[in-house]
């Protein structure tokens, strides 16, 4: 008997590259299922439990992981992030944002049909976005993210070539809307070719 696999469009990119904007553009297609990740980190200002993340205690997260209820888990600083299996829909295309470690875990999971989208923009563009998106930006945190991204994505590029690469620098919403449609259609074609 053939097992149904989770079809996942995994969006990946450095900080302030436009991952969340692309996710929202893709999610305008109601036939898709948005993945809401779990995390042990505390919510940031304005984040809502169950919308931005499922905020969990370390104990609850570890229990879910030990019970085999997490599809992928990654560790960053003192926090854990992951995708709960019960947060996926086997009958729909699932779409979410993942870090390189999460992508590698998904690549190794035979329950998943993966389509990876790499979102990129120049360091200058990302820095300007980082400074503009917060009222009082934490410059130390921005620098830390940039250094971490540099290391993570250098390693990632050596082991995986994305299915789709999108440069978001200097583009408008209409371009992103068109790219979002193209990504979904290309992912569907990709999976159809794999089954033939």
Where are these regions (language model features)?
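Small-molecule kinase domains that catalyze NTP-dependent phosphoryl transfer to phosphate-bearing small molecules
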Residues: 136-195
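ATP-binding Walker
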Residues: 17
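Post-Walker A helix-loop "phosphate-sensing" segment adjacent to the P-loop in P-loop NTPases
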Residues: 28-36
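ATP-dependent small-molecule kinase phosphotransfer cores
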Residues: 39-94, 98
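Hydrophobic anchor at the beta1->P-loop junction of P-loop NTPases
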Residues: 11
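Conserved phosphate-donor/acceptor-positioning beta-strand/loop module used by diverse small-molecule
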Residues: 95-99, 109-132
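P-loop (Walker A) phosphate-binding loop of NTP-binding proteins
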Residues: 14
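Walker A/P-loop
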Residues: 20
């Amino acid at each position: 008997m053939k097992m149904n696999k989770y079809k996942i469009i995994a969006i990946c990119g450095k900080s302030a590259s436009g991952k969340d904007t692309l996710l929202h553009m893709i999610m305008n297609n109601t036939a898709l299922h948005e993945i809401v990740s779990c995390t042990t980190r505390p919510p940031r200002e304005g984040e809502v439990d169950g919308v931005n993340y499922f905020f969990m205690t370390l104990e609850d997260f570890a229990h879910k992981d030990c019970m085999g209820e997490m599809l992928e888990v990654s560790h960053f600083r003192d926090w854990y992030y992951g995708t709960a299996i019960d947060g996926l829909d086997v009958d729909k295309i699932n779409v979410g944002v993942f870090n390189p470690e999460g992508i590698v875990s998904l690549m190794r999971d035979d329950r998943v049909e993966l389509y990876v989208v790499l979102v990129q923009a120049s360091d200058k563009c990302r820095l300007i976005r980082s400074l503009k998106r917060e009222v009082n930006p934490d410059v130390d945190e921005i620098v830390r993210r940039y250094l971490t991204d540099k290391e993570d994505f250098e390693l990632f590029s050596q082991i995986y070539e994305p299915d789709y690469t999108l440069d978001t620098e200097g583009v408008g919403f209409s371009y992103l809307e068109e790219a979002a449609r193209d990504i979904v259609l290309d992912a569907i074609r990709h999976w159809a070719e794999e089954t033939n």
